[in-house]
């Protein structure tokens, strides 16, 4: 156990240090984030990030993939391990991609998992159960990569309540939404929102400090956003003087991650 945990801590510390050096030379930072998806575009996303020397933050859930597997199964473990070795940052998206529906009057929450044995059913979770759901993704990440996950999470759909955020905070998790201009539109209809218009809008509206949101594959979009938009977006933003960093350097999360860089 000691042999697997210590290298993970060292790698996390090195990633934070590398991010600090990058941010120090950058006065117009952006924070590119990816939520899991059907994973069909994941290899191409990784190629673009490596070619452009961009570090991103990934939020992990165990989602259905194009070949009827799961995004955190054994097939994808080498892919996640390679991204971890490249110095990207990782947070939880809840293991079963669990949507918050409502706070319950007597305490706890109505939640709807997208995947898993209770998929598409509304289930009650108390604070401890929700924390365990967040931790499941972190545990699986460590199994796949030998590294530990950052104490960051993104609720599916960004749907939360003050009570849910407080419950997650009590067990050490910090929620990460996205900036309005950072919604890159890969979830939208490609007929109504073609890639060219999404790229134009992003280049026009994104401002320094924005958190950008994309996915590793969206089932409903017929003309995939990535990699068609991803690389011209990155190069276009760089031409405007922007640079990219992980959320370890975002002012909202930086101090918390330096104090507690990883989950147990």
Feature-to-residue mapping (PLM):
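A cross-family glycoside hydrolase active-site/sugar-binding cleft signature
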Residues: 33, 57-61, 91-93, 154-156, ...
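N-terminal signal peptide c-region/cleavage motif recognized by signal peptidases
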Residues: 18-20
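Bacterial N-terminal signal peptides that target proteins for export
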Residues: 1-9
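Acidic-and-aromatic substrate-binding clefts and catalytic sites of carbohydrate-active enzymes
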Residues: 36-41, 62-75, 98-103, 152-162, ...
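Active-site beta->alpha N-cap acidic-glycine motif
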Residues: 24-118, 122-125, 133-151
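His/Asp/Glu-enriched short active-site or ligand-binding loop at hydrolase and phosphoryl-transfer sites
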Residues: 159-205, 242-253
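C-terminal domain-boundary segment and adjacent tail
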Residues: 24, 56, 222-264
């Amino acid at each position: 156990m000691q042999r697997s945990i210590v290298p993970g801590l060292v790698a996390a510390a090195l990633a934070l240090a590398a991010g600090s050096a990058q941010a120090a030379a950058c006065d117009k930072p952006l924070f590119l984030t990816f939520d899991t998806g059907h994973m069909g575009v994941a290899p191409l996303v990784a190629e673009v990030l490596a070619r452009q020397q961009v570090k991103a933050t990934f939020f992990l859930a165990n989602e259905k993939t194009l070949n009827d597997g799961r995004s955190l199964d054994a097939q994808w473990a080498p892919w996640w391990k390679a991204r971890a070795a490249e110095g990207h940052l990782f947070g939880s998206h809840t293991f079963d991609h669990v949507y918050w529906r409502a706070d319950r009057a007597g305490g706890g929450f109505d939640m709807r998992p997208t995947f898993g044995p209770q998929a598409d059913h509304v289930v009650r979770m108390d604070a401890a159960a929700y924390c365990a759901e967040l931790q499941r993704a972190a545990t699986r990440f460590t199994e796949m990569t030998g590294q530990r996950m950052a104490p960051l999470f993104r609720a599916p759909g960004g749907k939360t309540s003050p009570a849910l955020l407080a419950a997650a905070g009590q067990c050490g998790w910090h929620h990460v939404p996205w900036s309005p201009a950072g919604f890159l539109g890969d979830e939208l209809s490609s007929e109504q929102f073609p890639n060219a218009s999404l790229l134009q809008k992003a280049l026009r509206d994104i401002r320094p400090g924005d958190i950008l949101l994309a996915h590793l594959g969206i089932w409903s979009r017929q003309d995939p956003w990535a990699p068609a938009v991803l690389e011209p977006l990155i190069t276009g933003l760089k031409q405007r003087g922007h640079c990219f960093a992980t959320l370890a350097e975002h002012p909202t999360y930086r101090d918390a991650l330096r104090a507690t860089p990883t989950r147990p």
